[in-house]
Each structure stands twice: as C-alpha cells, then as structure tokens.
Amino acid sequence: MSKLKSSESVRVVVRCRPMNGKEKAASYDKVVDVDVKLGQVSVKNPKGTSHEMPKTFTFDAVYDWNAKQFELYDETFRPLVDSVLQGFNGTIFAYGQTGTGKTYTMEGVRGDPEKRGVIPNSFDHIFTHISRSQNQQYLVRASYLEIYQEEIRDLLSKDQTKRLELKERPDTGVYVKDLSSFVTKSVKEIEHVMNVGNQNRSVGATNMNEHSSRSHAIFVITIECSEVGLDGENHIRVGKLNLVDLAGSERQAKTGAQGERLKEATKINLSLSALGNVISALVDGKSTHIPYRDSKLTRLLQDSLGGNAKTVMVANVGPASYNVEETLTTLRYANRAKNIKNKPRVNEDPKDALLREFQEEIARLKAQLEKRSIGRRKRREKRREGGGSGGGGEEEEEEGEEGEEDGDDKDDYWREQQEKLEIEKRAIVEDHSLVAEEKMRLLKEKEKKMEDLRREKDAAEMLGAKIKAMESKLLVGGKNIVDHTNEQQKILEQKRQEIAEQKRREREIQQQMESRDEETLELKETYTSLQQEVDIKTKKLKKLFSKLQAVKAEIHDLQEEHIKERQELEQTQNELTRELKLKHLIIENFIPLEEKNKIMNRSFFDDEEDHWKLHPITRLENQQMMKRPVSAVGYKRPLSQHARMSMMIRPEPRYRAENIMLLELDMPSRTTRDYEGPAISPKVQAALDAALQDEDEIQVDASSFESTASRKPKARPKSGRKSGSSSSSSGNPASQFYPQSRGLVPK
C-alpha cells in the first residue's frame, strides 16, 4: 500500500475546440465526438466505410467546445494548485497540434474574466489562499522563459539576445542558470510580470493559425511558506508550479511555412518528437534509458515526467476531418501519458529557500537597530550618573524620554534631543563671560553633536525602511479581509471541490461499470432455446469481430505512422549528412591541416549542454594572459629607472635598447623648380592681340547687288563650309570686297 500511495499517475484531460470559420467555409466534416460523462473521445475515419467502428479513447476527463474556462480550472487544475501551496511540485502543460487552442487554455482572453485561462486563474487562487491563511508567512516569486529553436531565453530580461544554460544539481535537479525571478506581492504585480514576458515572446502567423506560438513558454511560480511547527521552530515548505504552453506540432504542407518559419517548425517538431519518445520510454517497461537529454524541453520537464511532481496534461484537439491524422496522434500520445508514474513529495526545509534568507536578514537588521537603541540608553545612563543628585529634574526628564522611546515614540526623542542642543547653543552664544575662543570651541562641539545626532537618526531611519521593505515582500494572511466573507468563500470553494470530486468519482464508476457489463452478462445469461443461444452468440461474435477489426485498423495506423516517422528521420539524417559532407569539403580545401588538427585536439563534447566546445588555449581556464610589465610602457622591452636617466643624460649606447645610433637626416639639394603658369590662356591672349590691331578703312560697292537681286537664289550646297567658300569666291565677284570673319574664337 505504501508503494501505491507514494506513486501517482499523470492526470490527462482532453479539450476539443469548436469548428472555426475556415473549416466551416471549406465544408469539412466533424469527426470528433466527446462523451463528457464517460470521459471518452471517439474519432471517425472520414475515408472509411459506414460499418467501420470509430476509434475510442478514455481519459480522466474530457471537455467539449461548450466547456467554460472556470469549469475546467475548478474540476481539473484547482487540486493541483492546492498541492503546490502545500509544498509539492506541480506542472500543467498543454499539448497538441498548432491552432487547437493551447494558448487559449493556458492564458485565455485578457480583460475578460469569464475567458481567463489557467495561468490568470491560478494567480487569483494562490493570492486568495495566502490572504486567508493564518500564522504563516509566504514569499511568491515568478520567472518566465521560452525555448526558441533549442535556445533558452529569459523573457523578463532586458537583454533578449542572451542565451541561458541548463545546469543540474543532485539536491535541486535541473535548473536554468542566471534566470531572473521577481518577488510579487499581489495578483496585479504577477500579471504585470506575465504581460512583460508575453511582449517578448516569439509569435508568428501561419496558414493554420494567425497568432501561432513559435516557442515553448514556461511560467514558473515558486511559493515559499514558513510556519512554526510543533517543536517551536520555523519550518519552510517550497512548492513550484510550472505552467507550460507548448508550441504546436505542424506539417509544412498545411502551414505553408517557409524560410524562418520553416526552421522554427523543424525545431518545434524535433522537441515534441523527443517529448513523445520520453513518454513512450516511460510507459514501456523494457526501456532502461529515458532520453531526457534529447532536447531542452524534456530536460526541463524531467521532474514532471516520472519525477518529483504532480502533473496534469491537457491534450487539445480539433474536430475537423482536415486534421484527423494530427488528432489521432495527439490522442495516442495522451493515452500513453496516462500510464506515467510520478513520485511527488513535499519539499521541506530546502537549503536555498529565499524566505529563510529574508527572515535572517530581517532579524540581523532588527538586532542592529536594537543595538543602536541600547547604545543610546547607556549614554543617557552615564550622563544621569555624572549629573549626581542635583539633577533630579533632568533625571526625571531622561526617564520620561527612555519610557517614550521604549513606547516606540522615537520621533519625539530625536526632536527633544535636537531642541535641547539648540537651547545649549543659544545659552553659549548669550553667555558674555566666556572668552571668544572658548565660545567657538563649545559651539563647534555642539555642532558636532548635532551632526552625530542627525547621522544616527538617518541611519536608524534607513535601517527601519530596509526592514519595512523586506517585510513587505513577505505575505501574511488574515489582515485585510472580513472574517464573515472569508468563511463564506471558504465554504463555497469546499462545496465546489466536493462537486468536482463527485463528478470525477461518477465518471470513474461509469467507466468501471461499462468494462464489467460484458463479464456480468456472460455469467447471468440463461437461454430458453438453442436458437436464442445461437442468436446471442452470433451477436457477441459480431461485436468481438468488430473490435478485432478496430484493433487491426489501429495496428495498421500505428505501422503507417511509424513508417512516416522513420521516413522523416531518414530525410533529416540525409540532410544532416549532406551538410556534414559540405563542411568536410570546405575544411579539406580551405583550412590548413595544422589549424584543423589544433581545433580537433581542443574540441570536446559537453554532455551537460549537449553540444561541442573547445578547450581553452591555456592549461588553466581561469589563468589570465601575462600582462606587459609596468616598466615597459612606451618601450619594446623593460628598462630600469637608472637606464632611463642615463639614456637622457649621456648619448652613449650602453643603456639603449632601441635607436642605438642617433643619426641626423641627410637632406638632398633641390633639383626642381615650381611651375609658374601664364596669367592668361595663350589662345585668349592671341585673340585679344588680333582684335586690338589697327585696320585700314574698307570701301564696299553695293551696285553689283542690284543686278543679282532679281536672280534666283542658288540651292545651298550639301558640302557645307568648304563648298560655300569656294562657290562664293568663284561665282560672286562682290565677295572679294568683304573681309574674312574675325572674332575671339577662330573659325
């Protein structure tokens, strides 16, 4: 019995979404039937015959498209979150094809209380439980990460390019190094943390989903609870809730993924395939090795699958005939996951509990503050003893001050001390019997006392503020809630849990009754005639034959699925082989053999991070490179101070490490002359000279033009300038009286 109690099966529920607009427009058939009472999902074969039996799967609970978000949470997830508040580890993850509503199940619709998913409902549940608790201190932390293309990113970090590493310790198991976590004190704060992470998450559009998650996201809530035990000491319980939103498996032919989307889909499918292999290996009793290290996702879910955690798996499916193959694959994996056994235990008094560190730091600061107040009391007692019996009034005043301070009225104490010093300063200033030097000395002493008092007050206030800030991060219940309302809410939640538990028991009883009906019928049946017996036996035979056919069809489908997976793996292997050959070809032709051997000798495979690394060039990893000596600054080799001084004073080369021969430069005589160009261009100068020359008067006889005016003008010659000039010189006698054209530009 103890063995049965220590182990617990993974709880698997199935949720079917409604038909979307695209599926209705394409006139796809609905092939998924959901029986909520029996917890069964039946899938029809759209290509099969009418006599073919549908494939039926039974789960812990099933929800159809009419199920509300709060029903799903109250019946399935609330008991798990209660276990986390008691100190267990818990995991909720949504599994299924892309576009089936995994993100809707986990996150829901922001701003709509009725459509809030598992994550926002768990926030309300956790902080409501804390507010109703008594004599308990809580510390709630939140972290958010994603696995994008097998790289872990911190969604709450400012530097989104930083990649985180997975580490493992014997006491805590697998954890993410340098993952940031934020202490949250209310639902509003933890929702803000989730919203910041969602803005950094990788999301893209495909043909099957407009807002497709391109990464696996894990929201981690760590709840630490401190409570005084029967032994009178504080005991700390730490519960961790992992809320996992997986990216959906997808086929490139349906999603139309290309380029970066295709790379993302390949990595998503590989990690989900590794998750399926882990589930199969855990269920199969013959497997001696569980392949957790095949992907980052399976390593992070190592405790949730077969480890120290309570796990609920939500399998999301679509009802359309278009996705029947993916629906069957999801249901088969979910059916296998039912048989995984976990061994959850309460995490009591862990060494790395942050709550204990907070409590120790608060106690240290309070002790420091108390020490300061004790010092002030001792100083007052000394002053009182020094005052003697004559200072009875002052003694009574100081006793009153001490009583006020003990009554936590510290502000009045500081104010009275300051007023007292001010009165003493005024008395010194008004005392004319004192010498000026003595008066200045006394005033300086009072100023110093006032400064010390102010400094002590600031230090005490700073310590008090630090204590308040740390105490504000620790949540204590039962302060701001009306007891009557609190009790009513508790009763209401208990009734809800009882109803959910009753539904679960009814479902289990009905499943057991159906399985035993056949056995009881065989035992109780009596036949009045041989014909009746033949008819009943024939009916049973037909029923068994249909079951046999269903099992054969299931085996055939599994074989086909196995063949497809093998073909996909072979294709992946061929692509990797081709890429490897290309790398080898580049190395052989472009990288020298010595460099290749150096890198090969330094390379090693890191099992922790699951990839190849290079050993450091130096033997010791932390050893730093030798620095240049300080005496060698500005020189090629170290020099002593004496050598430097000798170099500056004497010209001899004894102490010189460089520039031993100091030679002056031998400057050669100049053999060239600077070019001096003309002030004006030669062509321009010639034109100006020609234009400025004196010319004789020209007489023109225009009588010849009168005789030639009546003649026809000759056609213009085609040859241009030369022919024109020759014809004018030969045919026109008047042209000899005209001079040739002149100008700045020669023609």
Swiss-Prot record:
GO cellular component terms attached to this protein's record: axon; centrosome; cilium; cytosol; dendrite; dendrite cytoplasm; dendritic spine; glutamatergic synapse
Record keywords: Acetylation, ATP-binding, Cell projection, Coiled coil, Cytoplasm, Cytoskeleton, Microtubule, Motor protein, Nucleotide-binding, Synapse
Biased composition (Low complexity): 722-735
UniProt region (Globular), positions on chain: 580-747
SUPFAM superfamilies: P-loop containing nucleoside triphosphate hydrolases (SSF52540)
Chain segments annotated as transmembrane: none
Region Disordered, residue ranges: 374-412, 698-747
Residues binding ATP: 96-103
Pfam families noted in UniProt: Kinesin
Classification via InterPro entries: Kinesin-like_fam, Kinesin_motor_CS, Kinesin_motor_dom, Kinesin_motor_dom_sf, P-loop_NTPase
Cellular localization per UniProt: Cytoplasm, Cytoskeleton; Cell projection, Cilium; Cell projection, Dendritic spine
Biased composition (Basic residues): 711-721
Keyword Signal: no
Any one GO molecular-function label of the UniProt entry: microtubule motor activity
Biased composition (Polar residues): 701-710
Coiled coil: 346-579
PTM-bearing positions, type N-acetylmethionine: 1
Chain's role: Microtubule-based molecular motor that transport intracellular cargos, such as vesicles, organelles and protein complexes. Uses ATP hydrolysis to generate force to bind and move along the microtubule. Plays a role in cilia formation. Involved in photoreceptor integrity and opsin trafficking in rod photoreceptors. Transports vesicles containing N-methyl-D-aspartate (NMDA) receptor subunit GRIN2A into neuronal dendrites.
Self-association and partners: Heterodimer of KIF3A and KIF3B. KIF3A/KIF3B heterodimer interacts with KIFAP3 forming a heterotrimeric (KIF3A/KIF3B/KIFAP3) complex. Interacts with the SMC3 subunit of the cohesin complex. Interacts directly with IFT20. Interacts with FLCN.
Family that this chain belongs to: Belongs to the TRAFAC class myosin-kinesin ATPase superfamily. Kinesin family. Kinesin II subfamily.
Protein name listed in UniProt: Kinesin-like protein KIF3B
Organism: Mus musculus (Mouse)
